[in-house]
Amino acid sequence: RLVYAANSRHALHDPAGIPVEVGALLGQSQPVAASLDAVADALDGGGCRIVLDASASEAVAERHADWLARGIHVVTACKLGQGGPLARWASIQAARRRGGACYGDSATVGAGLPILRSLRELQAGGDRIHAVAGVLSGSLAWLFHHYDGLRPFSNFVRAARDAGYTEPDPRDDLSGEDVRRKLLILARTAGHALESDAVQVDSLVPPALRDAPVAAFDDALPVLDAPMRERFAAAYKGGAKLRLVARLQAGGRATVGLEALAADDPLAIGGGTDNRVAIWSDRYSERPLVIQGPGAGAQVTA
């Protein structure tokens, strides 16, 4: 049963159980102030104790290790735990072992796709991971699948934003920072304990616009048109396709950037907002293991 539900401002607590439709209830009938300290207290008692973190909060991610150490299972789509500072990641691993609790992080990369599970099961079976590469952003997958080099790139960015594929501030997607966190999670899961700044990111946002107000960035979006048209033309001339690719190479080198891929490359195939990941290992050395499917959406993520 659900005994505690909270957003950033309000909380509901009832040991007898709360109706699942808590979204509407949190703004009604005398909710109490939300407190992260109250979460573990609300779960005192017997039975299977689980915290479901559907936030994107650094403060909540900082509590993951504490909950795990208390034997409370954590299920999350938040990338700030596994994809945050290395010390936080390490504390989560240690707390999970110490508390005997499970850390359900599959949805942090690829929504409902079995990407992290596959990496773990390969290694548990004695395989060694050599490299991982992927298209890990549904919004950027949509953007570069539809961009045709004829219409302005800025038009496609606005269309993706208006359709809800990007964040309200498209720089959150175009900067590659979200993909960087996902690649960190993949790398650490594959056995490379990388520091947060170890991933080299080639941002699509010009330096002059990285700190501009959202409205000013929207007005300045056309500055992306000419350089993107040139990159598209060069790729098209060679029969290639542009994709924003995250790569973990042998030795742990990690990069995120726009690449021109051969049309038959497993990362170039597919459309829409699909995520695609290729895994090379001892057993998948000549042809990679490829995982593909929807990388976003409430139902598959849940």
Predicted ranges, named:
Residues 55-70, 78-122:
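Rossmann-fold NAD(P)-binding glycine/threonine-rich loop
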Residues 130-132, 167-174, 290-294:
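A short glycine-threonine-serine/GTX helix/turn-capping micro-motif
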Residues 133, 141, 159, 247-302:
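Catalytic, metal-anchored helix/loop core of enzyme active sites in primary metabolism
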